[in-house]
Amino acid sequence: MKVLTTALLLVTLQCSHALSPTNCDASKPLAEKVLDLINKGRRSGYTFQLLRVSDAHLDRVETATIYYLVLDVVESDCWVLSTKAQDECLPAMRTSEVVIGQCKVIATRYSNESQDLSVNGYNCTMRSVSSAYINTKDSPVLVDSFEDSEPYRKLARKALDKYKAENGDFASFRVERAERVIRMRGGERTSYFIEFSVRNCSTQHFPRHPPVFGLCRVVLTYSTEASDLETPEYTDLICEVFNTEDLKNRSDMKPHRGHEHPHCDKHLCKLSGPRDHHHTHKTHEIGCPPPPEGKDNSDRPPLQEGALPQMLPGHSGPSGTNRSHRPPHNHSCNEHPCHGQHPHGHHPHGQHPHGHHPHGQHPHGHHPHGQHPHGHHPHGQHPHGHHPHGHHPHGDHPHGHHPHGHDFLDYGPCDPPSNSQELKGQYHRGHGPPHGHSRKRGPGKGLFPFHQRQIGYVYRLPPLNVGEVLTPPEANFPIFSLPNCNRPPQPEIRPFPQTASKSCPGKFEGKFPQVSNFFEHTPPK
């Protein structure tokens, strides 16, 4: 009995000293670099900008330092696939566009060199604060932000079709999905602000680096009494297009000049008549070529640039628990190549033993979307609340919400959209392709140097109401990492800390300081 008590005491002491609280404000420079890695790895949505380091702990293991960070963020006006430099991206300029969030992140640094910083995993929850922030009884304008943007995709498609009829060089682009929808009502007018992603679907011969996809912003204005949204009184459309070479050059190690859209210079150019205004904008970026070809990640961030460890999808227990473990044995680069097959039964994207199929093909009638025969639900709720073998392939989803959208690059640039499958799983990123489609990728394959396995998720929850606060993200991270051949074996990742550092949260920075009221943490003393 004494031996058992001593052993338990030693384990308790070891765990209690595993993580050291650290100063949030002092952690800000590192947090900004971590957030930049996350932004560069995501495939849809808008880039995050740091508002505050809300909590920070660290763990030193030999030559590595592992950081456990809670970051308060706000969406910028830059789409994640934009090639703009981060310092060119602005936070929301109007309160009607403010979307805030919080991310729990685990990152590892092996030295003080920025290239030795990598992201092990992250979970973010995002919510619009427009309605809660603006809509008061005295407000002359009412603002609504719509979580479900799919009903407005038709309006975006109609606006794009009208633009394409007037501009033949844009004829091969189609609407991918509506990314953000805001309605403003006031006076005698109602306006819809719709931002939507587009891709080039032409199979014709293009110059060396054709524009492949982009982001469009359309303003549709109606009279207050208008009930037919398909006939706006005024339409204003602006598009920003990107090409594959731009995406390859998203790091700043080696300069490379982007290529211009054939009909525009690097500034905004007007391409239509006075009633319906349309513009395109070509951006530039400098960077370096990508690493060996591989699968990109979804909002996942999915992460994109930098040397990130290769991770398996997270396995989590019941909601609110953390399950981070050391690998059962050492995995060398010889045992597990950095790219390719993974022995020992680990299959992050291919076929999964024991019925686990979070990505890729779904045998035995398991479909990535829709109904699942025999009661199998690889991505939604499981009968009686049980997941196969106690593991959920994507971790716990807050309030039943799944990561937003699908991977923008899941389809090649010339693949037609699937009406039945393309957007059914709009709130669950990371699905495999529609049943019957292969995982082969189009020209967009292998554009990003982020490691191939999805290591993070972004959950978009309904807009906040007055008096509500942001729902904190879960701390569900991958079960273990595979080695990076250029670094020593990954140190053990411990459960995410449940108590806050005494020197946190840090100083809140943002254009709208009142937004801090929507976070759980109170301002620092």
From Swiss-Prot:
Write down what this protein is called. Answer: Histidine-rich glycoprotein
How is the subunit organization of this protein annotated in UniProt?
A: Interacts with THBS1 (via the TSP type I repeats); the interaction blocks the antiangiogenic effect of THBS1 with CD36. Interacts with HPSE; the interaction is enhanced at acidic pH, partially inhibits binding of HPSE to cell surface receptors and modulates its enzymatic activity. Interacts (via the HRR domain) with TMP1; the interaction partially mediates the antiangiogenic properties of HRG. Interacts with kappa and lambda light chains of IgG molecules. Interacts with ATP5F1A; the interaction occurs on the surface of T-cells and alters their cell morphology in concert with CONA.
Recorded name of the encoding gene: Hrg
Q: Which residues carry this modification: Phosphoserine?
A: 145, 438
Q: Which GO terms describe its cellular component?
A: cell surface; extracellular region
Q: Where is the signal peptide?
A: 1-18
Q: What is its main location?
A: secreted
The annotated region (Disordered) lies at 275-445
SUPFAM superfamilies, alphabetized = Cystatin/monellin (SSF54403)
Site positions for Cleavage: 439-440
Q: Which cysteines are joined by disulfide bonds?
A: 24-504, 78-89, 103-124, 201-414, 216-239
The entry's function note states: Plasma glycoprotein that binds a number of ligands such as heme, heparin, heparan sulfate, thrombospondin, plasminogen, and divalent metal ions. Inhibits rosette formation. Acts as an adapter protein and implicated in regulating many processes such as immune complex and pathogen clearance, cell adhesion, angiogenesis, coagulation and fibrinolysis. Mediates clearance of necrotic cells through enhancing the phagocytosis of necrotic cells in a heparan sulfate-dependent pathway. This process can be regulated by the presence of certain HRG ligands such as heparin and zinc ions.
Query: Which sites does the entry annotate for glycosylation?
Result: 112, 123, 200, 322, 330
Organism of provenance: Rattus norvegicus (Rat)
- Domain Cystatin, by residue range, is 19-122, 135-240
Q: Where is the composition biased (Basic residues)?
A: 339-392, 426-443
PTM note says: N-glycosylated.
SMART domains, per the entry = CY
